[in-house]
């Protein structure tokens, strides 16, 4: 899959989340597609930063992301974070994703 296709999929994922009431502050592509080291079968690693996750526990966040992934039916591996969690950067995924590519938001 080329980078344009990946960006289109991430865009569809973000739109699907927003249609479900999640205001996405940022979407950060990280992992193999961000670094250019993808191979056939690579999934699309993305961090979704949203204020909507502030009062949600881990399992509720997974449910929200999983429902959107099922709707677009693409190989997305997503992690939900609040803006504060992203800014602190103390979660291991945030440390990896800091070197990623901002593909939505600012």
Task: Specify the residue positions occupied by each region the protein language model found.
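P-loop (Walker A) phosphate-binding loop of NTP-binding proteins
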Residues: 32
């Amino acid at each position: 899959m080329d980078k344009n296709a990946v960006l289109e999929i991430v865009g569809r994922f973000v739109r699907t989340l927003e249609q479900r009431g999640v205001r996405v502050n940022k979407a950060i592509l990280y992992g193999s597609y961000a670094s250019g080291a993808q191979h056939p079968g690579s999934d699309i690693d993305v961090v979704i930063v949203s204020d909507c996750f502030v009062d949600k526990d881990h399992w509720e966040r997974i449910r929200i992301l999983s429902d959107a992934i099922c709707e677009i039916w693409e190989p997305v591996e997503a992690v939900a974070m609040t803006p504060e969690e992203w800014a602190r950067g103390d979660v291991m995924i945030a440390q990896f994703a800091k070197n990623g590519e901002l593909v939505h938001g600012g």
